[in-house]
Amino acid sequence: MKKVLFLTYLLLHLFQTQALDFQDTTRFSNSKLIKFFTSPKYIISPFAFYLPETDLVIGVGLKKFYHLGNDSTTRTSNVASSLQYSLNGQFLLRSQYQIFAKDEKYYINGVIGFSRFPITFYGIGNQIDMTKNEPVTYDYFRFENLIYRKIGKNNFAGLGWRYLNTFNVKTQQNGKMETEPIEGNKGSTISGLNISYLFDNRDNILNPSKGFFSQVTYSIHGNITGSSHTFNRWLVDARYYLKPFRKREDVLAFQGYGFLTNGNVPFNELAQMGGDIIMRGYFQGSYRDKNLLAFQSEYRLQLLKRWGIVGFAGAGGISNEMGYFELKNIMPSYGGGLRFKINRKENVNLRMDYGFGNGQQNIYFFIAEAF
């Protein structure tokens, strides 16, 4: 679990902005500084954390909001960028974007980034020993882009390309990654075509309070697409949001998620349990295999204008074969967290989640909801 050394800016921002809700802003000489870090158009968030394999990591995140059309017919577009650097010389630079053209005639979704950061490799499959893990470091370039065209009300059809290059792989001597026949342990070049369908009538893509989201994406990788490994992948993501009480702003959210592959899949393209999105509480990648099915629900309770709390629970499992999930391998995920509305105009929350899994637990600090 990440040991958070300090979140100075975030904590100062929370308490100072909360005070501004109840007191005259002229009493705060640093109100301009607060406005600099958070405005209706962007959020800047410095951060720091510690991991044994990286030493101290410092970084900054920027989330930019803008509209390309009328607010009533075009939802908010956003670009989220982050830069991280560790005292061991590791770094990560990444930008993710969700762009709605005027009247949502087109929707573009993608990510581009480069990293040289270690991961912890526990093995592949359900039968792993959590104490026998090893660090793996590699250079990683990633570009994925999907362009959707509206084909009906809230319906979109999309085409895209994904290119991921893993190189300079450094493994533990005599470790699993070096001695076992693991796909991609010497590096890989993944290049493939994405074909996607999307239905989305959510009122807000970063913090929905109502609506339905359904996405099915099929990815093809092989020699013909310039890929070093031949495999296919299905991603299925369905979410539903509702307000259970008319006079309150509470939200009840549900998500079903499937990650299904076949073929020669590199280790870092396998389905992974854990992290800040799917199956919170587990270390990301502590369980990985060709296929993953998961379900989670979350209740978001608003307490004050800016503050709220959540409770979440879910279950999921991995398997080597697409149609073979054993009940005994289904694992639980549950926990709770705090929410602070860091941007009222776009209804964006800063979230802190504490999740528990099967013998694991983890804490997460992020901007925007998990789903």
Show the residue positions of the predicted features.
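Cleavable N-terminal export/targeting peptides
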Residues: 1-31
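Short loop/turn motifs that connect adjacent beta-strands in outer-membrane beta-barrel proteins
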Residues: 20, 28-40, 68-76, 102-107, ...
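Gram-negative/organellar outer-membrane beta-barrel architecture
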Residues: 35-44, 50-189, 289, 348-349, ...
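Transmembrane beta-strands of outer-membrane beta-barrel proteins
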Residues: 42-44, 77-81, 106-110, 156-159, ...
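Sequence/structural signature of outer-membrane beta-barrel proteins
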Residues: 65-69, 84-88, 115-119, 164-168, ...
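Extracellular loop and loop/strand-boundary signature of outer-membrane beta-barrel proteins
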Residues: 81-82, 127-133, 177-184, 220-226, ...
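Outer-membrane beta-barrel "beta-signal"
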Residues: 194-195, 335-340, 345, 360-371
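C-terminal outer-membrane beta-barrel translocator/porin domains of Gram-negative envelope proteins
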Residues: 195-198, 204-303, 312
